[in-house]
C-alpha cells in the first residue's frame, strides 16, 4: 500500500507567501485603485502598508483583509516612500511586483 507523506494541512500552509514591495517614487492614485479593483488576485487575503500617492501630501496607512480594505491618512514622519506587504496563497510574485511597479509614477523631470 502507498501513503502520502505530505498531509493536506502541511501543503496548505506552505502555499502561503508574502510579497514585499517598496518604491521611493509615489503611486498614482487612480492606477493603484484600478489595481485593487481589477487586478488584485483572489488569493491575496491580507495586505498592509504605508502608501504615498502623488495626489496627496498625506501618509496613507493601508489595511486589507479579504475583500475589505481601509486607508487612513496621517502626517509623514521621515522620508516618503511606499512600503506594502501582500499575504496570500500561491502568489505570482513577479506578476504582482510588475503590476505594482506599473502604479508607480515615473518622474517626468
Where are these regions (language model features)?
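C-terminal accessory "lid"/substrate-recognition subdomains
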Residues: 1-77, 82, 89-109
Amino acid at each position: 500500500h502507498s501513503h502520502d507523506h505530505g498531509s493536506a494541512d502541511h501543503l496548505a500552509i506552505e502555499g502561503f507567501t508574502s510579497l514585499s514591495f517598496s518604491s521611493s517614487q509615489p503611486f498614482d492614485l487612480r492606477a493603484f485603485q484600478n489595481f485593487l479593483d481589477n487586478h488584485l488576485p483572489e488569493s491575496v487575503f491580507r495586505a498592509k502598508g504605508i502608501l504615498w500617492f502623488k495626489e496627496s501630501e498625506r501618509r496613507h496607512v493601508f489595511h486589507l483583509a479579504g475583500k475589505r480594505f481601509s486607508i487612513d491618512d496621517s502626517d509623514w514622519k521621515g522620508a516618503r516612500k511606499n512600503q506594502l506587504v501582500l499575504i496570500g496563497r500561491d502568489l505570482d510574485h513577479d506578476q504582482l511586483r510588475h503590476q505594482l511597479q506599473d502604479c508607480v509614477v515615473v518622474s517626468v523631470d
